[in-house]
Structure formats: structure tokens, C-alpha cells
Amino acid sequence: MTLTERLREKISQAFYNHGLLCASYPIPIILFTGLCILACCYPLLKLPLPGTGPVEFSTPVKGYSPPPADSDHKQGEPSEQPEWYVGAPVAYIQQIFVKSSVSPWHRNLLAVDVFRSPLSRAFQLVEEIRNHVLRDSSGTKSLEEVCLQVTDLLPGLRKLRSLLPEHGCLLLSPGNFWQNDWERFHADPDIIGTIHQHEPKTLQTSATLKDLLFGVPGKYSGVSLYTRKRMVSYTITLVFQRYHAKFLSSLRARLMLLHPSPNCSLRAENLVHVHFKEEIGIAELIPLVTTYIILFAYIYFSTRKIDMVKSKWGLALAAVVTVLSSLLMSVGLCTLFGLTPTLNGGEIFPYLVVVIGLENVLVLTKSVVSTPVDLEVKLRIAQGLSSESWSIMKNAATELGIILIGYFTLVPAIQEFCLFAVVGLVSDFFLQMLFFTTVLSIDIRRMELADLNKRLPPESCLPSAKPVGRPARYERQQAVRPSTPHTITLQPSSFRNLRLPKRLRVIYFLARTRLAQRLIMAGTVVWIGILVYTDPAGLRTYLAAQVTEQSPLGEGSLGPMPVPSGVLPASHPDPAFSIFPPDAPKLPENQTLPGELPEHAGPAEGVHDSRAPEVTWGPEDEELWRKLSFRHWPTLFNYYNITLAKRYISLLPVIPVTLHLNPREALEGRHPQDGRSAWAPQEPLPAGLWESGPKGPGGTQTHGDITLYKVAALGLAAGIVLVLLLLCLYRVLCPRNYGQPGGGPGRRRRGELPCDDYGYAPPETEIVPLVLRGHLMDIECLASDGMLLVSCCLAGQVCVWDAQTGDCLTRIPRPGPRRDSCGGGAFETQENWERLSDGGKASPEEPGDSPPLRRRPRGPPPPSLFGDQPDLTCLIDTNFSVQLPPEPTQPEPRHRVGCGRSRDSGYDFSRLVQRVYQEEGLAAMRMPALRPPSPGPPLPQASQEEGTAPEKGSPPLAWTPSTAGSIWSLELQGNLIVVGRSSGRLEVWDAIEGVLCCSNEEISSGITALVFLDRRIVAARLNGSLDFFSLETHTSLSPLQFRGTPGRGSSPSSSVYSSSNTVTCHRTHTVPCAHQKPITALRAAAGRLVTGSQDHTLRVFRLDDSCCLFTLKGHSGAITAVYIDQTMVLASGGQDGAICLWDVLTGSRVSQTFAHRGDVTSLTCTASCVISSGLDDFISIWDRSTGIKLYSIQQDLGCGASLGVISDNLLVTGGQGCVSFWDLNYGDLLQTVYLGKNSEAQPARQILVLDNAAIVCNFGSELSLVYVPSVLEKLD
């Protein structure tokens, strides 16, 4: 699978899960979306309606005079001047833009020194402006004569009376915070607190007091303790009532003479007249409102032909609300991030939102209504989103790529449009995926099946070849189980390929081709290309300026040589180049330091002499007022009861002022508390970090670009926040059973199968499985190695089956002649124990940790014993050197098959066999014991080894002898079967010959679990102990093909031992107290053995030497299920219903989840999922990495533990006479297979998946062998 296919699959899965979430919890999602819309639209309360923002008009400064009060141009004659440009303006605004910095900077300065000393110079500037007088031939003119005189503030602004001027000239500066008193400023210990004390606590989008007095947005002022640019910017705002050109020119000349800006290239050519419209402009809204009405009508007209939509007008209204909310959210978010959207220069943006939103609505509607109607609503929504997920994400990625390219063209018009567009796309995607999808799910949910049956479908209008009495909609015939719910399936393609109405064809064409979005993207690319080439301040000019600046021939003179990265610049804050060493003494006032720039003097020769000034000016500084809120000037004039509605003001060119402050002035301007405050000295920053930004044309620096980058970063952060919110909502509200439709929680019903990619639901099928019969009682143990299948029932009978053909190869014990007509039979189980006199057949004791298991030589089966005699082989004693006691001290609990009749004549053996006959009388129907011979030990020793109580509840017809005990565990590898019995006896059988290879004569506690891995056998016992055994053969092992039907070309998955070999089993290690209570679970993999016990703990052993590595504690109940694989991932389940994931390498618990309300009965894992089942009849699927529950499947009663994993994507579960196949990735029910009438009433108690794509189902005393290759081929 390629990367694109994997990415497409992941995106499809994400959209599928999202559709399930929206359809499962519609009301909370709609409420959440509504809150998000309101929160994003809150900044719009302070914005004008579209079309009511201020309008600009520029005129040259040279020769300017106020226009006459009456327009002199004729009616209907075209004119360049707008209609509102008549008469004198309300006021003339003159801003003196001040940039100041402390240079050079060294590490001994504090953060407060960045702005305290520069702000102190504002008082001197204000004093210079107030004292300026124009003297010419006509007389003298002072500021008081030409400025706008204001009176009292409005009565509701008492708090601002000490900050804003009254009864005098309207002059604003940062000094107003301290009533223009330098002493008050110098005595203020907290400048930041004074500036922000009148800031609103909530979100404020209109002009604030700080913006009014500073004249620049707060983020550009540099008055902050955490600024990285050590530069302070503010303006001194003068408001004139009359335009006096000579006075303004003299004021500009004086200020530029006192505070020169040598690198300033600001143009002072134009006046900008700003006209403010009425607060409510209905006329401008008519085109946009008309567009949305047309959108509503078109969607309603189009959806009238879609029968799958319940409320046509409701869907159209939801589409309009989605598009309108997307527009409002975009404008609100842009305002929140610092942009001032007026939509004057981009009226096309709302209409683009309409077009894009309409197309997305049509795409989603078409995709959802095209899904099969027999599916549940949430599955239809999920499949509809999943089918369009790739195209949606591909178009969104393309649009974002075009926007990103356009943003980095450095053209302001393109950058503004791109910022609006990216926020608009994110908000539109958010609303489409949450709001409209949820509303669509609610509408489709109202479309009940009863409503569908009330109207005739289109296919009923077709001529029918059958009689008229045929029903209109064909029902799929249910061959069996007529009581089950019917399934409505789609008709064949010949019925479905009807001619659609024209309006639907238009909708489907737009949705299929996405023509509108592609045309918009193409137009955007062309527009960006034209603006990039023609814009004078765009990327082309910027690159040309960079080349010219670095060229030695640029502009006819040698430009500044670029400094390598390893060379320190002049303003580097290294101590060796600092103007003040850390321990430098304070100098007298009449001395200056080398390299310092004295006031009113040129640059001195020294280390800190910088020919490139740090304070730079760029084209964006000419009209900095544009960055202010559009309500900045109306708010200022409203304070004095002056309205700007239907009037205009004139903005004069900015007067630049540059202030260079040396460190000594910053130190002298400190407040005594500054050194003891929390403003700790900041670490020095490289000079490049606090310069204005990248240099633009002419060597200027465009720090406005950095602002745009910040806005883009904020937009990206907003998108990430929205995604995180969606993720949190998904994690919190995601239904745990979203993958299963139906009435019950997470329970699938027949007839509710999801459809495939072609729109068809997979049918329910019924097959005739291979039924494996031969057990008298319920099957308890199953084992397989892929080619052989071994089963054991409660009666102790072991059957070996061919997993390919279902033939019974061997039965252990072998059947013999019937004894009576009751249906039972005595099978020949007596091996040739009498042939022990043939020497060498019984292996002697070998040195080791414990006595070896006795092996049995192979040979033909001997004749059976008399059916009416008990087994007296236990009384045979070959040790003639020891005198037997007259009576055994311990009872001999041996049960064998026999009639128990005694002889009438002959030697009286009653003293020896009386107890055996009495016991045989209690259980006369039991068969002879299957026991290897004992060559030497005396009878008491044999009695002690095999002393176990008989089974109380055994049926009269049983297969396993009571002395050996019932079979508790079973394992298979190759052709060897390892059996663990309740008496503690371990037996190794040949699966093909049906003979006993070897057994353990040391009777101990019952074997509860077995592990047969390679040549090692591990037995877990009831008393909590572990025994490690090793299989050995006297000749080499060779993989052989066991006897079976021809045609199986594959070899067995494990080694098959040759029949000529003699197998012995030695116990290598014993852990006497592995657990304090019985061991209930045992698994081995990757050289590790994991045990689980009723003492609530797990233990990890090394398989080689039985060394205990870890004891894992985390469950509050007995361990019931354990899983471990080759990746060292361990999962455990207990009676507390919890599932724990462990790291076998470290012994640490990775996660814990409470999965079930009862015991965890089985546990398995795939590469990405953990699958568990419990006594609550639920199968839960968990994410393996996060431990989050994906979904659950409710099983039929008694089928909770019947599950199997065929592959990483396919799960099989059992039901009442059926098996179901599920897609693990999506939780989809793929197919349900019924196993015939014989198994209809039987629950599948156990499922075993074989290597040859076969499934073995345990239905009580019968097994069903099922092959489902079609599902496997489809998934693979």
C-alpha cells in the first residue's frame, strides 16, 4: 500500500468516525457549534455593518484648499471627487510619529529602561509644540489660534477628565496619563500599571484610552516588559480646526531640525480625507441579502426533487445559516486577531463565501442521500462523509496552498485577502463538518421507513414483465428464519439508472466536478500573478532591492558590506564591547564615554558607532493610522459630543521624529524602586532580534510584515485550537458503541448490514458447514496447529481431526467392542503392559532435578481385557525383596470398567482384591485405566503417587478413568498432544497413532494450564506451582507429513515427530510457589512465560531457566485472561472487569481500563487493537496505543467468549447458530453466516481460527468447520 493510499484510508476513517459522532449526538453538537458561532461573532458587536465603514479620498498637499460648501460641478457630469467631499472637514489631524530607543544596549539595563526614558521625552516634545510660534510678515500665529478648541467631556466620562484635555487645544500624547507633568511621571513607580489601569477587562474591539493617547495600536508601542524589540513608538496627536499651511510647514521644519531622522524617506504629498457613513446602512446590504435569499430559494427548489430529504425548507435554511455563519465567524475572527475588516476593498469576499459554501452543501447532501436507505442514519451519514473525505481534504489542501503562496508574495492587498480567506475556509469547514452534517442527520432520521413505503419509488413506474399483482418494491426472500427482521436492499443497476431531473443533474454535476471552487482557485492564481507583477511594493521590487543592496555597483556607490555570522555587529551585547563593564565606576556628568552619541552631535568614532541607524522608517509608517480601529476617531470626537456621521476629517502627512537615547539617560531616568521591582534584567538578545524587521526597498525595514506573520500564526493557532476542540468533543461524547446500529446498545441486528463501496449491502448467507461429531458430552478443550485439530469433551475423550477435510483421524482412547445395549462401550485402552519382561522397554531413572517421566515404547495395540473383570494390574508387584503388608494402609481410589462379579472357586484372592471389587461395584461401568507400567516401586508408593479422590459428578458413561482424572488442559504441536489432568498427571500422546508416548507418574496438584512451545512444556498447577519439562528423542527429529487426505501441499506449522522415535520428557525446573493461589492463565512468547493467578497478580518468568523477572500487581480480582506476543506487549484481564497493558521489558503498567461489568473471559490483540470479551456478553475493541474504547459488540446470550481474529482487519464472532464477520477498523458488520438448521438453536461457545482460513465453532458436543474465503479475499 502506497503512502497516498494509506493517507486516504486514514482520512476516510477519520471522516467515518466523525459522521458517526455527529449522527449519534446531534443536539450537543449543535449546541456546541452555536456557542462557537456566538463566541466568534462577539467582536462584530463593535464593527459596522458591511458597506458602512469609512471611505477615503486623497488630495495633494501642494496647493490644497478646503472645498467649497456647494458642489460646483453640474448634475450628472462625472467627477473624480466623491459627493461627500464638500465643505471644510470637521478637523485636521496632525500626528507627530516618535520612534525612540536606548542605544547601545547593555546587560546592566532593566526591562523598564526600554520605555521609561523614551516616554519621558514626550513631555519635552509637547512643550516644544505648545511653544511653537509662526512669525511672518502677516504677524504671529500660535497653536492656540489654529487648533481645535474643546470644552467639557460628556457627563458620563468623569474618570477620563484628568486624562483628556478640556477647555483648550485637543492635543493628545502619552504624557496625558500623568497630566503632562514630568514630576508626576518621574515619581510613578509603576508605569505599566498606570497605562493599563483604564483598559477594559473584557474583549474590546473599539478604540481604547491607550490607543487614543499613544496614537498607535498597543502592540506597536513597545511599552511592555516582554518586548523583544527595544524600541518605543507613539504619536503626539494635534487636532486643528483650520488648515494653515505655513504654520504646519514651520512646525514640521522645526521638529525635524531638533530631532532629525537621517534615514527617513516618508512622503508628505497627500492629505487623506476619511468620510464616516451612518451607523446603519441598509442600502449597502441589499445585494448581499438578495444573494442569500436566492441561495435559500435555489437550495429549496433543488431539494424538492430529493425524496430522501424530509424538510426541504429546513435544509435550505440550514444551508443559508451555515454560509452566513461562516462569513460572520470569518469577520469576527479576523477582528479578534487584529485585522480591521470593513469589506470595502473586498466586497467580493462575502460572495465567494456564498459560492464555496453552496458547493460544499451540495456535495455533502448528494453524498449522504446517495447511500442505501436500508442503513441506519448514522451509518448513512458516516459513509457519506467517508466517500467524499478525500475530495474535501484535497480541495482544502489545494486552496490553503494557493493562499500560502499568495501570502508570501508580500503584496499587501494579496496578504489581506489571504488572511481573510484562510480564516474563512477554516470556519466554513468547521460549520460544514459540525453544523450542517448534524442538521442533515436529523432531517434524514425523520425519514422513517414508513414514510418511504407510503410513496411509490421511481422504479415502480417502470413497466413490469410480471403480472400486475406483483408488489412495487421487491423484497429479498428470507429462505430461513422468517421471524427475523427483513432487509430492504437496493434494486439492480438496471432499475437504479433512471433519468434524473434537470435540477438534480445540475446539483450532481456541481458536486461531482467542484466547478465553482476550481474556477475560484484558478482566478485567484491569475489575480495573484497579476498583482505580484504590477504591485510597486511587491515581491519583484523587494527582490530587486535586495540585489541592489548587496551589489557593489548598486545606486552608484558602495553599499553596506554584509557581515558574516561569526563577526560581532556594532551593537552586539557582548561584555567586551559593552559601554559599561559590570563593575565600571560612575563617570562625572561632564564626561562622555568613547563611542557614545552625545545629544546634538554627530556619531563619534568608537566601537559602538553604527553607520546604519537602528531606528528605521518604512512606507508603512506613512499611514500608521490605518492600523487603528475604524472607530478610533469617532470615539475621540464623541467624547466631546462631536459626531462624525455623514462628515469627514482630513489626515495630514505624518511628521517623523527620531530620538536616540544613550544608556546614561536611561540610568538617570530610573525610579528608585525599579531596581527592587520584579523587572529583572533581561538577558541580552542579538541585535537582529530587536531590529524592526526585514529591510524593504531603499534599505528600510518592514516590520509590518512581521505583524502579518503574527496574524497568520494566530490564524493557524485558531485552526489548531478548533481541531483540538473537535478532538476533545470526540473523545468526550463519542459513543462507545457507535459502530453498531440497532435498538440495543452496540448490538447489531440481522438485516442492518452496511453497504460496500458500490452501494449494496452484503447479504446474509447460509452455508452447510462440516459437522464434526463423535463426542458424547460437551466439548471443553480445543487445540490446533493449523493442520490438525484436537478436541476433548467432559467425558475425557480426545478426538484428532483433519482440519482440512474434517475427517476423524484418531480417538484417544481407541474404541473397543460394546458391552451391552445401553449405548455405552468399553474401548480397548490396555497397552501391552505385560510385555515389560522384554527388557529395555522401560527407561531407567536418569540423573536430573527430578525423576524423569516414564516413556512408552511404540508397538501394535494389544488385545483388550475381559470386559467383565476389573483392572487388577495395580496389584502386581515385581519387587520380591520387600514383604507386602497384608492390607494397604491407604485406600486405592481406582475406577475401571468391569461388571464386578467374583469367582466361585479357586484360590481365594479376595483378601487382595476385595477393596478393588468393592470400588468397582460403586462404578461398575467405568473402563480400564490407561496407565503405563510401574517397573519397580512397591504398592504403597504407587498408592501415594496416585492418591486422588474420584470425580463425584461423573456420568455413568465416561471415557476417562477416575484414577487418571479428568482432562483440564490440552495443547498440540506437530503430532504430539500434551494433556494435563485433574490428578496432576501429565501425558504426551501421539496424535496420529493414538498411543501414549510418555506420562508423569508423580501425582501432584491438578494441571490447570499448559504451554507447549518448541520442545518445552510448562505445566501450571492448582496449588500455584510451575513445572518445566523438556522433550527429548533418542533419534533426530525430522518434519514428516502426517497421514491425511492428499491434496494438502503445505507442511504443518510445527515439527512432526517420527513414529520410530522414542520420546522422553524430563522435568528441568520446578517453581514450587509461583503463586499463592491456583494459576488460572498461562501464556508464553518471546522467551517469556506469563502466569496469572487467583491471588490477583501476574508473574513473568524467563522460559529458559524459570527465573522470575517481575511480579505485576494492578488487578483487584483474580486473573482470568492473559495475552502476550512477540513484541513484548502483555495484556491481562481479571474478574474485576479491568484490562491492563504491561511492558514486559520493564515490568511497568502502561494503561488500565475497566472494560466489562463481569469477568474478562478472553483477550487478544492485533497490531492496533485490543479485543476483550466478558461475562456481560460484550466484545469490546480498544485502541492499543491510547487505551481508548473504540466500540463494543453485544453478543447473544452465552456467546460472549466466542471470538477470533482472522487478520488485523477482520474479526469473527459467534451467535445463535451463526458467525459474524466484522471490520475492526470501522466496526462494520461485513457478513453474517448461518450454519444450518442443526446449529440454529445452539450458541457458539468457542471459536478457533485455523491457519488455513478455516473457523472451528464449538456448538456443545459438535464442532462446525466453516470456510469463508470470500470475506478474506475482499479485505486482502
UniProtKB/Swiss-Prot annotation:
GO terms of biological process kind: cholesterol metabolic process; COPII-coated vesicle cargo loading; immune response; lipid metabolic process; positive regulation of cholesterol biosynthetic process; regulation of cholesterol biosynthetic process; regulation of fatty acid biosynthetic process; regulation of fatty acid metabolic process
Regions annotated as coiled coil: none
Region (Loop-1): 46-284
Pfam families reported for this sequence: Beta-prop_SCAP (PF24017), SCAP_N (PF24006), Sterol-sensing (PF12349)
WD repeat ranges, renumbered to this chain: 771-811, 949-999, 1002-1039, 1074-1111, 1114-1152, 1155-1192, 1194-1232
Annotated stretches, region: Disordered: 60-81, 669-698, 834-903, 927-960
Residues recorded with modification Omega-N-methylarginine: R1048
Membrane topology summary: Multi-pass membrane protein
Domain SSD: residue ranges: 284-442
Residue ranges, compositional bias (Pro residues): 930-940
Keyword tags: Cholesterol metabolism, Cytoplasmic vesicle, Endoplasmic reticulum, Glycoprotein, Golgi apparatus, Isopeptide bond, Lipid metabolism, Lipid-binding, Membrane, Methylation, Phosphoprotein, Repeat, Steroid metabolism, Sterol metabolism, Transmembrane, Transmembrane helix, Ubl conjugation, WD repeat
Lumenal domain ranges by topology: 40-279, 334-344, 423, 540-707
Region (Loop-7): 535-710
One GO CC term on file: endoplasmic reticulum membrane
Principal place of residence: endoplasmic reticulum
Membrane topology, Cytoplasmic segments: 1-18, 301-312, 366-401, 445-518, 729-1276
Job description of the protein: Escort protein required for cholesterol as well as lipid homeostasis. Regulates export of the SCAP-SREBP complex from the endoplasmic reticulum to the Golgi upon low cholesterol, thereby regulating the processing of sterol regulatory element-binding proteins (SREBPs) SREBF1/SREBP1 and SREBF2/SREBP2. At high sterol concentrations, formation of a ternary complex with INSIG (INSIG1 or INSIG2) leads to mask the ER export signal in SCAP, promoting retention of the complex in the endoplasmic reticulum.
Domain characteristics, as noted in the entry: Loop-1 binds to loop-7, enabling interaction with COPII-coated vesicles. When levels of cholesterol in the endoplasmic reticulum increase, Loop-1 binds to cholesterol instead, thereby disrupting direct binding between the two loops and preventing the SCAP-SREBP complex from exiting the endoplasmic reticulum. Cholesterol bound to SSD domain of SCAP or oxysterol bound to INSIG (INSIG1 or INSIG2) leads to masking of an ER export signal (also named MELADL motif) on SCAP possibly by moving the signal further away from the ER membrane.
Quaternary assembly: Membrane region forms a homotetramer. Component of the SCAP-SREBP complex (composed of SCAP and SREBF1/SREBP1 or SREBF2/SREBP2); interacts with SREBF1/SREBP1 or SREBF2/SREBP2 through its C-terminal cytoplasmic domain. Forms a ternary complex with INSIG1 or INSIG2 through its transmembrane domains at high sterol concentrations. Interacts with PAQR3; the interaction anchors the SCAP-SREBP complex to the Golgi apparatus in low cholesterol conditions. Interacts with the SEC23-SEC24 complex in a SAR1-GTP-dependent manner through an ER export signal in its third cytoplasmic loop.
This protein's name: Sterol regulatory element-binding protein cleavage-activating protein
Species the sequence originates in: Mus musculus
